[in-house]
Design a protein with these regions (language model features):
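Post-transcriptional modification and biogenesis factors for structured RNAs
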Residues: 1-192
Length: 192
């Protein structure tokens, strides 16, 4: 039986309303074989908004037995995502140089939470993650972050490459980090 680590909403109209109300939806799951005009409207909306979706077997819906889920579930993010440009503008307006942590292909929620905890202590202005191929912000990620994910702005972008180019154009310096580095991050002046 599927276990959900995030808040879920179910039902075609409820999910459509959440999307139209611009709620933070991480993924929409459709029961395999689902059909109908209303489903087609929802599916078009999901594609138009570029929301991640997946077709899943009936077993995924067992925790919602007895509820009229209509073969549709949506995972809702526990935090609001911020716009990266708005965050950068706010930090610059305070007279500081933004320190944005870009996380690419971090797929384990506990790793994401641990990194966020360290990032908050290191003075990071915001965390930037991709829409796809990334761990979702879940209760496990928040717990591991010791609440840092509630304090740090988290930005989610569809195209990291394009966003990185825009950040460079705005004057931000980029640093890469790896576990094979010769220096620890505290030995580098990242706000120079």
């Amino acid at each position: 039986m599927a276990k959900f680590k995030q808040e879920c909403i179910f039902g075609i109209r409820a999910v459509m309303e959440a999307i139209q109300d611009e709620k933070e939806i991480d993924k929409v799951m459709f029961r395999q074989g689902i059909k109908g005009d209303l489903f087609q409207q929802l599916f078009s909306l999901v594609r138009e908004r570029q929301i991640q979706f997946q077709y899943v077997p009936e077993e995924v819906f067992k925790p919602f037995a007895g509820k009229n889920h209509q073969g549709v579930l949506a995972e809702i993010s526990p935090i609001p995502y911020q716009d990266i440009n708005t965050v950068v503008d706010a930090v610059v307006a305070e007279g500081e140089m933004p320190l944005i942590l870009i996380l690419d292909r971090i797929t384990d929620v506990r790793n994401l939470g641990g990194i966020a905890r360290t990032a908050e202590c290191a003075g990071v202005s915001a965390i930037l993650i991709p829409n796809k191929n990334s761990a979702k912000i879940s209760s496990d990620a928040i717990k591991t972050s010791a609440g840092a994910l509630y304090h740090l702005p988290v930005c989610r972008e569809k195209n990291l490459k394009k966003t990185i180019k825009e950040l460079k154009r705005r004057g931000l310096t980029l640093f890469a980090a790896t576990e094979k580095a010769d220096k620890f991050y505290t030995e580098v002046d990242m706000k120079e």
